[in-house]
Amino acid sequence: MQTGAVTSILFDFESGELLEKWLYFTSDTHFDSVYCNRNMFFSDLDQAKLRDAFVFVIGDFFDAMQGRFDPRRDMSILRPEYRRSDYYDYVVKDSSEKLEKYANNIAMIAPGNHELSVLKNANTFLSDRLVSYLNNKTGSRIIHGGYGGW
């Protein structure tokens, strides 16, 4: 349920039994940056999958600072495979393919200021596209979360 920037996720456990559930929270992955530690990221996701954990991606999954209209643009920090004219399209496609096997564990992907900057300057919502792709491809029910600051 989305109310403004607040995302509520309700879990209905009908059995009435005590249930232990692992939760995995990650933020600021900056997946398309050369500084993203992908080995650690995927190792953590493998552990989450093994434990049947709910995964919450809390903002800035994408670095997304190398677009044409971003004043912070520095191509040297963009992973080489994304240095192409369809950068935003390709990074969504590539990352979604790499996340497919974890889709049923991912409960929510929320945008951060990096995704919102791309939405403002390039009129595309990277995190929403990622969620849509994963849900359509895998049948998962990932929620696209909100963004807010207090």
Predicted regions and their residues:
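N-terminal soluble segments of membrane proteins
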Residues: 1-5
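Short, intrinsically disordered, charge-balanced linker/junction segments flanking boundaries
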Residues: 145-150
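Core catalytic region of metal-dependent phosphoesterases/phosphodiesterases
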Residues: 9-21, 26, 31-144
